[in-house]
């Protein structure tokens, strides 16, 4: 679950949070984190975004763990991950969405070994061949 403290956020940041919810709710692909629900907690003044849980964390932590133990990823694993990342990106691009913050910390690994792209709060929608920040609320 992602918690966004709404108090003190700029209007732009609030719109960005709402945009992430709108984008996530419209996506359905095996390599994109699933959106579950969102709710506003009046007590804590936070917007709570419930997303699919990736049991094996993110790729950034896997890389750090391997470096710590001087382990290497198998080439086959790297290729499988690359293909899954590209399939997720293709799906986003086919839907005129650019991730804009693709990094190991935003690529998650499920318990069955599937990679999923997440954290789309800086995503933008491409319109008429030009990328524009999406600020509307659906």
Predicted regions and their residues:
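Catalytic-loop of the protein kinase fold
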Residues: 93-109
């Amino acid at each position: 679950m992602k918690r966004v403290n709404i108090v003190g956020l700029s209007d732009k940041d609030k719109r960005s949070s709402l945009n992430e919810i709108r984008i996530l709710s419209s996506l359905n692909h095996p390599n994109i984190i699933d959106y579950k629900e969102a709710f506003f907690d009046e007590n804590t003044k936070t917007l709570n975004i419930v997303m699919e849980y990736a049991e094996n964390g993110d790729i950034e932590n896997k890389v750090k763990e391997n470096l710590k133990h001087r382990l290497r990823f198998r080439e086959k694993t790297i290729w499988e991950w690359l293909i899954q990342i590209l399939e997720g990106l293709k799906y986003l691009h086919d839907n005129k969405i650019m991730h804009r913050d693709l990094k190991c910390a935003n690529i998650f690994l499920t318990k069955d070994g599937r990679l999923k792209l997440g954290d789309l709060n800086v995503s933008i929608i491409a319109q008429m061949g030009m990328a524009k920040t999406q600020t509307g609320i659906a």
